[in-house]
């Protein structure tokens, strides 16, 4: 039992007074104060951690993993997850932390926008730059140069060596009349229409698209003015392409193209055979590099020693200058030419002059 204070009055009357209890409000205030301090401390800690996290993220986003890093080929396969992509980049040491990269991607809401493909990435790039490249699909482009004068077979081999599919598939497409019709080429094959130039393609570019781009380039070069010139000369576009392909194969020195073109135009006007060795060679399966008298006597749709006029079609893919020469030949009376074995030719107006040139430059007499 506890003691309680007693009040004694003058008349001797005593009254017991209860001891006052602790103030409830004071207790509540104390607890609230403690909670406030705890929450404040927690908020300060969270704020500090947030600031630290934001600083770390900002530093990660804008800092390359290695300023001296060299470019690496990174292949993002279709359907690859964000986790897989970030781990691949971290494994290749393109980025320092895969988790932070995933946070960056998700924060930017770009997880579904990363495009598959072959990329040239480097640790000298910032994660932000890397993400931009992946989202924009700025994949590596591989170049392939098609020289003037290659035929379909040679072009197909070049495409295969460059890693853009097989030679067979390329030839199947290029020789498909239906595909040629789709491309609005009025010919059975695309021989002559795969324009010689340097092209840039993604590694996974289908051959169909490669061929389409080559034909589109031909259509750009063969301008409306050239089409009108073709009509003025009385030729079809296919005939001009055929003639240009012969000029391309006969030319060793580019300055001679218009003169060589004039020889063929002059012979066509006179009803003479073109007598062009490259046309004979084109018509010989598995030509071994040595043209023989038998070859010259063998009748094929391409042997211009045996047939009059142009061969059955182009024998190669001519470049712009050969097409231009076919449309705008030099004005000459030449009917013959023979190689001087130095990339140039000796041009002649008569068979007598030509035979003399042959003896001098070919027979050494």
Task: Locate the predicted segments by residue.
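Hydrophobic alpha-helical segments
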Residues: 33, 45-48, 83, 153, ...
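A generic signature of intrinsically disordered, low-complexity regions enriched in glycine/proline
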Residues: 8, 14-17, 62, 275, ...
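N-terminal type II signal-anchor transmembrane helix
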Residues: 23-68
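Signal peptide-directed extracytoplasmic domains
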Residues: 53-222
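N-terminal hydrophobic or amphipathic segments with adjacent small-residue motifs
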Residues: 42-47, 73, 143, 228, ...
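N-terminal Lys/Arg-rich, disordered targeting/topogenic segments
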Residues: 2-32
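Bacterial extracytoplasmic/cell-wall-associated proteins, especially those involved in peptidoglycan
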Residues: 81, 145, 158-171, 179-365
């Amino acid at each position: 039992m506890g003691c309680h204070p007693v009040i004694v009055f003058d008349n001797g009357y005593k009254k017991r007074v209860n001891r006052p209890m602790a103030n409830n409000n004071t207790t509540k205030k104390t607890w609230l104060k403690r909670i406030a301090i705890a929450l404040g401390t927690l908020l300060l800690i969270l704020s500090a951690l947030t600031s630290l996290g934001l600083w770390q993220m900002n530093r990660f986003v804008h800092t390359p993993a290695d300023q001296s890093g060299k470019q690496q080929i990174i292949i993002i396969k279709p359907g690859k997850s964000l986790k897989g992509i970030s781990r691949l980049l971290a494994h290749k040491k393109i980025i320092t932390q895969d988790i932070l990269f995933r946070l960056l991607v998700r924060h930017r809401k770009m997880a579904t926008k990363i495009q598959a493909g072959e990329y040239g990435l480097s640790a000298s790039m910032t994660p932000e730059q890397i993400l931009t490249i992946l989202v924009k699909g700025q994949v590596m482009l591989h170049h392939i140069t098609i020289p003037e004068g290659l035929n379909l077979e040679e072009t197909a081999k070049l495409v295969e060596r460059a890693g853009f599919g097989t030679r067979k598939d390329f030839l199947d497409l290029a020789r498909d009349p239906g595909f040629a019709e789709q491309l609005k080429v009025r010919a059975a094959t695309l021989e002559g229409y795969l324009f010689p130039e340097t092209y840039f393609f993604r590694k996974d570019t289908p051959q169909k698209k490669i061929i389409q781009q080559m034909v589109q380039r031909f259509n750009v070069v063969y301008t409306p003015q050239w089409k009108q010139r073709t009509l003025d000369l009385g030729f079809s576009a296919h005939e001009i392409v055929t003639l240009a392909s012969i000029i391309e194969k006969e030319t060793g020195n580019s300055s001679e193209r218009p003169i060589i073109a004039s020889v063929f135009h002059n012979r066509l006007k006179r009803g003479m055979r073109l007598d062009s060795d490259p046309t004979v060679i084109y018509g010989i399966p598995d030509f071994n590099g040595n043209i023989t008298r038998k070859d010259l006597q063998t009748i094929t749709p391409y042997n211009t020693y045996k047939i009059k006029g142009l061969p059955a079609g182009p024998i190669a893919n001519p470049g712009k200058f050969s097409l231009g020469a076919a449309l705008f030949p030099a004005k000459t009376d030449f009917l013959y030419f023979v190689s001087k074995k130095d990339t140039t030719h000796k041009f002649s107006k008569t068979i007598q002059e030509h035979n003399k040139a042959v003896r001098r430059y070919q027979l050494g007499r």
